[in-house]
Each structure stands twice: as C-alpha cells, then as structure tokens.
Regions:
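Short alpha-helical DNA-recognition segment
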Residues: 37-55
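Intrinsically disordered, low-complexity and often Lys/Arg-enriched segments
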Residues: 1-8
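A short, Lys/Arg-rich alpha-helix, primarily the initiator
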Residues: 10-35, 83
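The DNA-recognition helices of helix-turn-helix-type DNA-binding domains
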Residues: 50, 61, 76, 89-90
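Short, basic-rich loop-to-helix N-cap that marks the start of a DNA-contacting helix
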Residues: 61-75
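Helix-turn-helix DNA-binding elements, focusing on the entry/boundary residues of the two helices
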Residues: 29, 40, 66-69
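Short, charged recognition helix plus adjacent turn
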Residues: 83-117
Length: 117
C-alpha cells in the first residue's frame, strides 16, 4: 500500500442515525443474550461464528454481514423480527404516499360496461 493510501473502515461513511440504530441493535442483542444467561462462547458456537464476531455484533459493528446478524437473532429466538423490518403494512411513509396518489374521483366512461353488477 502506498504511503498516501487510506484504509477505509466499514461504516465510517454511514449516516449518524444508521450508526445509532446499529449500536442499539447490538445493545439489544447483548441484553437478550444476558437475559437468556447464554455465555458469549456458547452463543457464538451456536451461530457458527467466532467469539470476536459475536462481540462485534453486540457493539453494532457495521462491518458485520447482515446474514451474521440474522444468525445471531436466530440463536436468540428473535429471527421472526427480521421479516417485519420493512413490512409494507408498517411503512407509514409509503402508505401515506400511496394514499396521496389515489384518485379523488372515479368516473365511468360512457358506452363501456362497468365492472360492477
């Protein structure tokens, strides 16, 4: 590597709200593991990851693969939460935008049969 080259750390260009959300996720994972009284070594073994990687997850490290976070949540019995993350039913912004695009009035064209009774 040349002298002027910089090594970019994963996550250094993430927006602050993303960094905070990952840290909170890591803390929540740590709390869940501790409530279950599972030692880090045992939890990491169950997730087929190293103890070091598990600790990175608990710190909310953005360099850890999303699949690793999913395995950790599976080990803790929380994997069903992943499916709800971007569920359209919980997307208040998307639902509001969709509602704004709905037509105010619906008119039937003359001469064509309507789809109703």
């Amino acid at each position: 590597m040349s002298q002027g080259a910089k090594v970019r750390r994963p996550g250094c260009d993430l927006p602050l709200p993303v960094v905070r959300a990952l840290r909170k996720l890591g803390q929540d994972i740590r709390d869940a593991r501790r409530r279950r009284r599972i030692p880090v070594a045992v939890a990491a073994e169950r997730a087929s990851i190293s103890k070091t990687t598990w600790l990175k997850v608990e710190k909310g490290d953005p360099g850890v693969l999303a699949g690793t976070y999913a395995k950790v949540l599976f080990v803790l019995g929380l994997v069903e939460k992943i499916a709800q993350l971007a569920d359209p039913a919980n997307d208040s912004v998307g639902l509001r935008l969709e509602e704004e695009r709905l037509p105010r009035r619906i008119r039937h064209k003359k001469g064509k049969p309507s789809g109703g009774l």
